[in-house]
Amino acid sequence: MHLMYTLDNEGKRVYTLKKMTEEGEITKSAHPARFSPDDKYSRQRVTLKKRYNLLPQ
């Protein structure tokens, strides 16, 4: 059983253990992706996040 979340009307995370909400919306995993030192695509991910201002300030 994994911790999942969905966003409420204010954009805040609401945590649950269910895979779907009562409205039928699929929840997202609250756990970060596994880290791998052999990550081949980290440069591309960082470049895209910078381009779309998704990196934390």
Swiss-Prot record:
Cited InterPro entries: H/ACA_rnp_Nop10 (IPR007264), H/ACA_rnp_Nop10_sf (IPR036756)
Span list, region Disordered: 22-42
UniProt key word Lyase: no
Protein's name in the database: H/ACA ribonucleoprotein complex subunit NOP10
Keywords: Nucleus, Ribonucleoprotein, Ribosome biogenesis, rRNA processing
Subunit description: Component of the small nucleolar ribonucleoprotein particles containing H/ACA-type snoRNAs (H/ACA snoRNPs).
Predominant location: nucleus
Gene Ontology CC, one term: box H/ACA snoRNP complex
GO biological process: one example: positive regulation of telomerase RNA localization to Cajal body
GO molecular-function terms, A-Z: snoRNA binding; telomerase RNA binding
Pfam families to which the protein is assigned, alphabetical: Nop10p
Similarity remark: Belongs to the NOP10 family.
Stored SUPFAM superfamilies: Nop10-like SnoRNP
Source organism: Candida glabrata (strain ATCC 2001 / BCRC 20586 / JCM 3761 / NBRC 0622 / NRRL Y-65 / CBS 138)
Lineage: Eukaryota, Fungi, Dikarya, Ascomycota, Saccharomycotina
Subcellular location: Nucleus, Nucleolus
Nucleotide-binding recorded as keyword: no
